[in-house]
């Protein structure tokens, strides 16, 4: 019984194989499957096309029949294609069964002139014997393995024995003299926040001991130095240069520096490590933003003259990249010219000169008294004592009241104190103008004169530090004896002292009679 055939798909297969798309009735087609569910390798089938019935009338549904026999490539039409594509034209077609599925090699004989048969070489007797020996050896090995498995199962199987210790991997690159480096630059700081600046200070020493030529070696050196801080380990990309490595260590320890905090961060770095390290880290933090970093660094330079000189040199350069490259040279030259170190401090020795102690030309009366003799603690119980000639300048400030302003000496050659004498507030029942030694008050506390008389006695008005009413708090009753009016009388010269003493005695007697 003929099987169903799809003429349109069959014509497409003819076209794909370079044939005329005109299949005829009774054509024998050798179908080659180039792949399928059996795996790699070709499989073959042989079919006959049925387009008419026995009377010569066309069939309503074209079909095909399986054709037995070995494929003859000289006479049969060859069509090749994938398994699924061929089954769309020949419905339910499968490779032939038996030796015919191998196509031209089904009978094991060569066909001269056939392209597929030219490279075929049948197996020899020697090869057959060798294959038999290989199969026998494999069977013996399988038998031995089964016996070993039975013995293990009978005796019990324990835990697997650990393998041998792996041999250490060969060293990649040169050996790092880590002990020598530590003896030169010291041990790693215990605080991770100090590692970045410590490494920045040690880069020159590291290069002097162990020159580094590539970033892989730099990465190995840094990781060996910071082995006590596993969180600071660098990768190969982070160790492209020393600046990049230091910046990466800073970010790992401190976090990314925000733009609004960059000025404070660079200021702290400048105080610890100098302006060069602050500039390098600033360029790393900002990805080479010259304008931002220079705007911060210029505020850290010592002096406006240095900033102006550096700015004038940078203005002559072409671009920001050239300015950043020449920044260390410009700053080093300026610091060297000014005699400054990396912190902007003078490296010249300081000459300490002792200032000359010069006596003021016109020292005040209060200053002379403080230099000669300390102030007494209590003057309420002191009696009047005429000053001696050698103490006329030193005793004057001792007798003045603590609340009164300092006054210049009168009648002596000690000079005049030009310090202003403000008016004191009204207190202790004194007159409205306050205690003013250059005003004379009459009865009732009203001023009678606007200046001191040429020769005042103790009874004509108040003296500096005294009371205009002849007495003060803690000095006895107001209507007491005459001694109370003469206790706080102070004279600036010997003549005035003598005259004032006589007048004070007379005034005391009159006060007692009244």
Swiss-Prot record:
Other comments? Foamy viruses are distinct from other retroviruses in many respects. Their protease is active as an uncleaved Pro-Pol protein. Mature particles do not include the usual processed retroviral structural protein (MA, CA and NC), but instead contain two large Gag proteins. Their functional nucleic acid appears to be either RNA or dsDNA (up to 20% of extracellular particles), because they probably proceed either to an early (before integration) or late reverse transcription (after assembly). Foamy viruses have the ability to retrotranspose intracellularly with high efficiency.
Q: Which residue intervals are annotated with compositional bias (Low complexity) in the record?
A: 419-430
List where Polar residues composition bias occurs. Answer: 352-394
Q: Which GO terms describe its cellular component?
A: host cell; host cell nucleus; host cell perinuclear region of cytoplasm; host cytoskeleton; viral nucleocapsid
Q: Which domain of life is it from?
A: Viruses
MF term (GO), any = DNA binding
According to the UniProt entry, the coiled-coil residues are none
Sorted keywords for this record are: Capsid protein, Cytoplasmic inwards viral transport, DNA-binding, Host cytoplasm, Host nucleus, Host-virus interaction, Microtubular inwards viral transport, RNA-binding, Viral nucleoprotein, Virion, Virus entry into host cell
Presence of the UniProt keyword Ribosomal protein in the record: no
* GO biological process terms on file: microtubule-dependent intracellular transport of viral material towards nucleus; symbiont entry into host cell; viral release from host cell
Protein name, UniProt field: Gag polyprotein
Biased composition (Gly residues) is annotated at 463-483
The secretion signal range is none
Q: Does the keyword Lyase apply?
A: no
């Amino acid at each position: 019984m003929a099987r169903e055939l799809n003429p349109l798909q069959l014509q497409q297969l003819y076209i794909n194989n370079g044939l005329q798309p005109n299949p005829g009735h009774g054509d024998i087609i050798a179908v080659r499957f180039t792949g399928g569910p059996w795996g790699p390798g070709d499989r073959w089938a042989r079919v006959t096309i049925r387009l008419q019935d026995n009377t010569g009338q066309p069939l309503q549904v074209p079909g095909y029949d399986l054709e037995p026999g070995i494929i003859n490539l000289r006479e049969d039409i060859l069509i090749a294609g994938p398994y699924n594509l061929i089954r769309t034209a020949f419905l339910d077609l499968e490779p032939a069964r038996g030796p015919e599925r191998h196509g031209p090699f089904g009978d094991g004989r060569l066909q001269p002139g056939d392209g597929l048969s030219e490279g075929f070489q049948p197996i020899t007797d020697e090869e057959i014997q060798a294959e038999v020996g290989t199969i026998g050896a494999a069977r013996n090995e399988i038998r031995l393995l089964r016996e070993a498995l039975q013995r293990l199962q009978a005796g019990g199987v324990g835990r697997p024995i650990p393998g041998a210790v792996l041999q250490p991997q060969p060293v990649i690159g040169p050996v790092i003299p880590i002990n020598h480096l530590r003896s030169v630059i010291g041990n790693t700081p215990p605080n991770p926040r100090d590692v970045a600046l410590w490494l920045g200070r040690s880069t020159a020493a590291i290069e002097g001991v162990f020159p580094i030529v590539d970033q892989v070696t730099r990465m190995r050196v840094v990781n060996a130095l910071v082995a006590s801080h596993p969180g600071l380990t660098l990768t190969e990309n982070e160790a492209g240069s020393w600046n990049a490595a230091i910046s990466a260590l800073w970010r790992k320890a401190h976090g990314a520096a925000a733009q609004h905090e960059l000025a404070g961060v660079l200021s702290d770095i400048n105080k610890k490590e100098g302006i060069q390290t602050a500039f390098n880290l600033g360029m790393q933090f900002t990805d080479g933003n010259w304008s931002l970093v220079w705007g911060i660094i210029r505020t850290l330079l010592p002096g406006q003259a240095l900033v102006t000189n550096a700015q004038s040199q940078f203005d002559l350069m072409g671009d920001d990249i050239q300015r950043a490259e020449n920044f260390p040279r410009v700053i080093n030259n300026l610091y060297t010219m000014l005699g400054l170190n990396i912190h902007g401090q003078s490296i010249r020795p300081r000459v300490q000169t002792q200032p000359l102690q010069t006596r003021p030309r016109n020292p005040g009366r209060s200053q002379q008294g403080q230099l000669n003799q300390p102030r007494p603690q209590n003057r309420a119980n002191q009696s009047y004592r005429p000053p001696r000639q050698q103490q006329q300048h030193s005793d004057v400030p001792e007798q003045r009241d603590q609340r009164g302003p300092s006054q210049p000496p009168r009648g002596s050659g000690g000079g005049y104190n030009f310090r202003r004498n403000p008016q004191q507030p009204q207190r202790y029942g004194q007159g409205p103008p306050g205690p003013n030694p250059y005003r004379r008050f009459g009865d009732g506390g009203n001023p009678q004169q606007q200046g001191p008389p040429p020769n005042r006695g103790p009874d004509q008005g108040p003296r500096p530090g005294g009371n205009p009413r002849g007495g003060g708090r803690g000095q006895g009753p107001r209507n007491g004896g005459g001694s109370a009016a003469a206790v706080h009388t102070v004279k600036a010269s010997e003549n005035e002292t003598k005259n004032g003493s006589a007048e004070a005695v007379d005034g005391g007697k009159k006060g007692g009679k009244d």
